[in-house]
Structures are given as C-alpha cells and as structure tokens.
Amino acid sequence: MSRYRGPRLRVVRRLGELPGLSRKNPRRAYPPGQHGQARKKRSEYAIRLEEKQKLRFNYGVTEGQLIRYVKKARRATGSTGQKLLELLEMRLDNTVFRLGMAGTIPAARQLVNHGHITVNGKVVDIPSYQCRPGEVIAVRNQERSRRLVEANMQYPGLANLPSHLEFDKNTLTGKVNAVIEREWIALQINELLVVEYYSRKA
C-alpha cells in the first residue's frame, strides 16, 4: 500500500487531530461524506483499524513499513506498543518535525529527501533513519537549505520541544539526548489497540 497523497483535511475529519499530517483543524467534527453525521455502533475491529490508521497517516508510513515496525517492536524488550511509538517517533523525518524545522512530517520528509539535513555532519536523505541518543541533527550548510528551514520555522507545527531533544535556533542545530518518553508523544493514540489489530496480521 502506497503513501497517502490525497486531501489531508478529509483524513483529519475522519480520524481526529493528526499533528504530524496537518496543522489545520476541521470545521466539521464529523467524518466526510453523505453519511458522515450518521451515528452507528462501531465494531471492535473498526475501532482497532481506526487507531492503526491514525498511526499510519500521522507518521506518513506505508502499511508495509508499519508492519515491519510492529515486528521489530515485538522483538524488543518491554511494552510492544511503547516500542512501536518510539520507533516511529525516532525516525529522522519525525525528529526534524519535532525540532521545529518543518510544520508537518511530510514537509520534514521533503527536507530529508532533498538532502537539506545532516546527521553528525553527514547528509542523510533517508526519512526512516533511526535517530539515536547523542546524534546531532542540523541543517546543511548551504544558503538554500537554511532559507527553507528558516521559512518553515515561522509556522511551527507543535509549540513545545520534547524533553529528549534540544535545538539552537541560531545555528539551526539540534541534538538527540535520549529516546522520547511516552508523555511527549503529541498524537492521541491507544497503541495497545494497534498491537491488537496486528496480532493476527503481522
């Protein structure tokens, strides 16, 4: 399944606030479509599916990528759901977003894809790169790269910098000090339901 490139606000109306996908809030609080306002009891499967879709759309990953993250989280020690969120949050595109260099994760992914971001002084153009504690994330020392990020910073996506990151606005340099803690994850999600959704699939 490919990455979603359609209308973002339509997804937000269906799934609720997705800070990584869009800064816009829908004017209508019900899902889009002819029967958007109809109320019917949802099945447990539908509820789990919706939580899974929140993760997929918020972080901009494909179904295949999400399945691989679930499998990797299962192999790790501790809570599978917590580890799954950590793997998604520590992606380079999401880290660039959380540092405030881009207003959304798709915008951050574009910065990474186009070679505007460095990790420990070397250009890394892989959005899924897993950032580790101690690594320095910076803007490439080129005028075009700096202009793009400075323009993005005029319209930040999230107000607060997570506790595991630090960022110097003058040098456009950030540092990963630790793995993110659960309380700093901006997306409202029940990760246990996502793990349950994949229990028979992944």
Swiss-Prot record:
InterPro entries: Ribosomal_uS4, Ribosomal_uS4_bac-type, Ribosomal_uS4_CS, Ribosomal_uS4_N, S4_RNA-bd, S4_RNA-bd_sf. One of its GO terms (biological process) is translation. Keywords: Ribonucleoprotein, Ribosomal protein, RNA-binding, rRNA-binding. Pfam families: Ribosomal_S4 (PF00163), S4 (PF01479). SUPFAM superfamilies: Alpha-L RNA-binding motif. GO terms for molecular function: rRNA binding; structural constituent of ribosome. Residues 90-151 form the S4 RNA-binding domain. Gene3D superfamilies: Ribosomal Protein S4 Delta 41, Chain A, domain 1 (1.10.1050.10), RNA-binding S4 domain (3.10.290.10). Residues 16-42 are annotated as: Disordered. Part of the 30S ribosomal subunit. Contacts protein S5. The interaction surface between S4 and S5 is involved in control of translational fidelity. PANTHER family: 30S 40S RIBOSOMAL PROTEIN, SMALL RIBOSOMAL SUBUNIT PROTEIN US4M. Belongs to the universal ribosomal protein uS4 family. This is Small ribosomal subunit protein uS4. It comes from Rippkaea orientalis (strain PCC 8801 / RF-1). The gene is rpsD.
